[in-house]
A protein has these predicted regions:
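Non-catalytic regulatory/accessory regions that flank a structured catalytic core
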Residues: 1-5
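A phosphate-binding catalytic loop at a beta-strand-loop-alpha-helix junction
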Residues: 96-114
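Cysteine-based protein phosphatase catalytic domain of the PTP/DSP
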Residues: 6-10, 15-97, 118-151
Length: 152
């Protein structure tokens, strides 16, 4: 019988063996899933207060944390913040496949994945959004977040 807790932890490959997206890992079995999928690094876009990292995360993966605002705060991410996230992602990519997450993988982590597709793979913002919505159906960035993509 499958482990129900593990089956609820979703990991979607945006680009196979390059970039994956999903919600914050919260248990050791989530870390096992990341390792089983070949993930080498984790980029967190939420605060530790929003989603405390599970024990062992930093011992098992190369990790970076860059907190971006979401719908619960009074501002959109700034272009400089998105650029910082892309720089962190590029640095982590040198170690292998990267898992990008926020709390629920609806706004912030999809935004960074969209920006990666635009900047590193030459997709238009609309094409990147169409693609990401196919491979990661939970994608739901806010209009103000999407507007940043045109400024990359």
């Amino acid at each position: 019988m499958p482990d129900r807790g593990q089956s609820r932890f979703r990991l979607d490959w945006v680009l196979v063996q390059e970039l994956a997206v999903g919600p914050a890992p919260r248990a050791e079995r989530h870390l096992d899933r990341l390792a089983d999928e070949g993930v080498q690094a984790v980029l967190s876009l939420c605060s530790e207060a929003e989603a405390p990292p599970p024990p062992g995360l930093e011992a098992r993966f190369e990790c970076r944390r860059l907190v971006l605002p979401d719908h619960r705060v009074e501002r959109m991410p700034e272009l400089a913040e998105l650029e910082q996230a892309l720089a962190a992602l590029a640095e982590l990519r040198a170690t292998g496949p990267v898992f990008v997450h926020c709390v629920a993988a609806m706004e912030r982590s999809p935004l960074v994945c969209l920006a990666w597709l635009v900047r590193s793979h030459g997709l238009t913002p609309q094409r990147a959004l169409d693609y990401l919505m196919q491979v990661h159906p939970g994608t739901n960035p806010l209009p103000g977040q999407l507007a940043l993509l045109a400024r990359l």
